[in-house]
Amino acid sequence: MRPDTAPGAPLLRYRRQPCCIGDVGEEVRRTTYDRAQRRAYRRKVQLCLDVFETMLTKSRFDSDRPLSGMEIECNLVDGNYQPAMSNRHVLEAIADPAYQRELGAYNIEFNVPPRPLPGHTVLDLETEVRTSLNEAQIRAGSDGTRIVMIGILPTLMPEHLSRDGWMSESTRYAALNDSIFSARGEDIPIRISGPEPLSWEAATIAPESACTSMQLHLQVAPEDFAANWNAAQVMAGPQLALGANSPYFFGHRLWSETRIEVFAQSTDTRPEELKVQGVRPRVWFGERWITSILDLFKENIRYFPSLLPELSDEDPVAELAAGRVPALPELRLHNGTVYRWNRPVYDVLEVDGVGRPHLRLENRVLPAGPTVVDMLANSAFYYGTLRALSEDQKPIWTKMSFAAAHANFLAAARHGIDARLHWPDRGEVAAADLVLDTLLPIAHEGLRRWGVDAEVRERFLGVIEGRAKAGRNGATWQVATVQALEEDGMTRPAALAEMLRRYCDHMHANEPVHTWPC
């Protein structure tokens, strides 16, 4: 039984935030906006920010029983392991509101209900997620469709995204596509370096649909948000080095976590001239440590014009004055079109039908896959290090420049588990050594503070230890397997399809990726 539905437990529901391109969120009413709407939206977003600032000082945010949550973005493939543009039919077959459409017609998302971390929760979650995904696969697979958890579908090729039908049916997605290209005024060049460099011109935001991630949510008190966000930024590099799972895009071997660069380039609203001027990209690591969640929302408004200036009827000042919790839809919608790897979230948690404001930190660093046990090991490592680092009396971010944290993130995206990362008091160190010598003990201590049972800590952090010792994650396994198949005479497309077939078999077996044979 799920913790949030146990007898006598309060009924907990998030009001789904209209978030990034890949999230369904709330549908919009139009695909184009005039100048008056944009001016009115700018004023409304600022008004929402003013109300939010007041709430931070005067309102009681729900944080007594911090909850964690998870979203897993998945791909759909046919019997030949090629992209299946069939999410509408698949979702009808699954018939479970926990599964939603994503940007691409070959994508779906699984939303895991929020729950507390202590005790055996993560072990229970492993069983629940596996059961749900297996049931979804049975229902979706009547026509041979398979659900795949992976950072980028390796069999995805340009021709799949160059014809009609790649996008899910949604006014919201069409509006975002139009807004991004209106801002740019030209096609988006996709230029990615690596062992097999890629150059391609995108006439739509279709390449973004290739990027499927696992998103981790943590409910945080307002006074603790800055420390948690700073710690998450520090951990983004090590996190990504361990979890990289996207070495191929359009048949090219590129970065260990190519998803990072594909996402950044495919949603870039800046033409070349604005890049040269130093205009900030919407996919953004950030540029400084923060002292309040308000810093991030102020940056959103200061640096980024609206993409979807959709106005609501809510008067946030009147709502707050009446003692109700304002939804602040304009602030949230705008926040959802600034693509931070660690995103602040304002939301309203409904407890037994009563709305309570709360804040979440949404970690968007990791790719989906390879297995449920690997993803939960990644989440345990993240939640553990986050707890310990955010509570340190001498915070690590006071000993480390923000630029160094960003450099670690990019090095991890490029080189994965073979990356060398900068760490205070250690200088430049191999990512695997940093995990084994420094970060695993921190993660154990953090999970202990969360009240996570010892056997749970040992199971999931043991997976992280095994991965670091073996030097193998999803990206290294994919590359090694494709290389072996090509050495046996397979073409690249055939090798990618066969690799994906084996990947799916291992995924369902739920053995950690570092134990998989090539």
Where are these regions (language model features)?
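Phosphate/nucleotide-binding catalytic core
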Residues: 8-518
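Extreme N-terminal basic, low-complexity initiation segments
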Residues: 2-5
